[in-house]
């Protein structure tokens, strides 16, 4: 049996037809994303990305390897609440950045400039967020009784639903290096 090169031009024809149809539509409306950032190269966006990278590293330096000891010590509810609030603020910031980048890209997925912008944002935020992976893993290694005690009274009780959601993943959690 000999293999013959395919002469199927259907995908190319479909792409050309889509391009012609898009051109026929004229200028389409665009989302106003100014509530997130004024532009892809705005100082506010660039500053938030840099701050996210720095703050993720600082978060890891401050909290990595310490959650179990904090839970066993005095003022566990207050200290763990501080850690969860720090984590929450970082997740909000990173989410804002990626929401903006994703919406910019979704506005015109054929624009290579937007595709590069989205890819660059994804790479930087993925790298930064790798410094946050330890947090939920460590929460799941805390003794159940100690964590329940910390959540029973004090400000950590506010985060009980989120912590319980994190704890549901405990049976499926892998070793830190594999995660």
Cite the ranges covered by each PLM segment.
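A well-structured
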Residues: 2-179
